Amino acid sequence: MISKKLTTALLILFTSFSFAQEEPSVEKSIFGIQTGILGVWVHNEARLTNSIALRTEIGLDFGINGNDNTTTTALIPSIRVEPRWYYNLEKRIAKNRKIANNSGNFLALNVTYNPDWFYISNRENINVISTVAFIPKWGIKRTVGNHFTYEAGIGLGGFIVLEDYETDTNVALDLHLRIGYTF
């Protein structure tokens, strides 16, 4: 009698676990490196909610400036904070697609600070202007294998020059294509 009740209880317990579905969620924390045509970055994505992650990033952004006589290229430091809303995780799960390493489509607000602390350039004594950019954007991120990622995104916003000598309205375009590795 006890074994029959125990068997029935275990059967109900295992059945209820098999029907319980976990809600799709971004990863608790992801650390990685990325590179693209326009620089190299180290990043972390931390879960805020099941579909929102806060991406923090430091790196070197590539810049180019040219005129008739010379072309100047430079790598300048960047510090980025970017809340991301991964809006299609449930749809990806329903289609048996990966959401590992936060693979999915996202909407974000990119806030980037480019200080004039230092630069790496092909020319001496260039003028690096400190800026802060605010750019809403759309993007995709995908995982290949277990650790390799690629992502693309586009956004249009504005930036503020932190020196006193410029008061114009500035438009900023964020267009990125990156490959990376997550640890």
Question: Which functions belong to the PLM regions below?
Answer:
Residues 34, 43-45, 84-86, 139-141, ...:
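Transmembrane beta-barrel domains of outer membrane proteins
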Residues 31-35, 56-58, 105-111, 136, ...:
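Membrane-embedded beta-strand positions of outer-membrane beta-barrel proteins
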Residues 1-27, 179, 183:
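Bacterial Sec-dependent N-terminal signal peptides
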Residues 37-39, 58-64, 85-87, 111-117, ...:
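Transmembrane beta-strands of outer-membrane beta-barrel pores
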Residues 21-27, 51, 88-104, 144-148:
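Short loop/turn motifs that connect adjacent beta-strands in outer-membrane beta-barrel proteins
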Residues 25-31, 36-38, 73-79, 128-134, ...:
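Residues that define the transmembrane beta-barrel architecture of outer-membrane proteins
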Residues 77-94, 171-183:
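Outer-membrane beta-barrel "beta-signal"
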